[in-house]
Design a protein with these regions (language model features):
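Charge-dense, helix-prone N-terminal extensions
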Residues: 2-161
């Protein structure tokens, strides 16, 4: 016999066990001291600056997840079930990923000449999967943040003035 469960119960169980879109959400969000220890002081400041730049232009839901097999943590910016970008952290390294769909790749080509050669090279070297081109940047400073904001604007118009 199949037992039908109320939707409220199912949502509660999903939240309780921490599954969100296939990701494993963290029960304990890493503290500033944990992140500083993991990244080092200078990279933690870069992480904070990148988050501030995104937060300044976008009102998004932020989700902490495990970082999978290659990273310690993932910090995802989402709205309406769609991911804008994800930040990743592991020992002395930051990752910043944007996934470009087919239409977004066309928009990238339209602004390519306004972007740095470093950003364009990283884009060109990224693999294309069935759901898009997965571009991973590893910022060590804030030099390319203006370029990153242009890339995010391809994905979604800023919703903060």
């Amino acid at each position: 016999m199949i037992k039908v469960l109320p939707v409220k119960f199912i949502i509660y169980r999903i939240e309780q066990i921490g599954i969100c879109g296939g990701d494993i959400m963290l029960e304990n969000i890493p503290s500033q001291s944990i992140m500083t220890e993991l990244l080092g002081q200078s990279l933690y400041e870069v992480w904070q600056a990148l988050c501030s730049s995104i937060d300044e232009k976008y009102d998004m839901e932020q989700l902490w997840n495990t970082g999978g097999k290659n990273w310690t943590y993932e910090y995802k910016y989402r709205r309406g079930g769609k991911t804008l970008c994800s930040l990743y952290a592991k020992s002395n390294c930051i990752g910043f990923m944007i996934i470009f769909g087919k239409d977004e790749r066309t928009k990238f080509e339209a602004i390519r000449n306004t972007l740095s050669t470093v950003v364009c090279r990283q884009y060109d070297e990224a693999k294309i999967y069935r759901d898009g081109k997965w571009v991973m940047f590893e910022p060590a400073n804030t030099a390319d943040f203006d370029n990153y904001m242009k890339l995010l604007a391809i994905k979604r118009k800023p919703n903060r003035k």
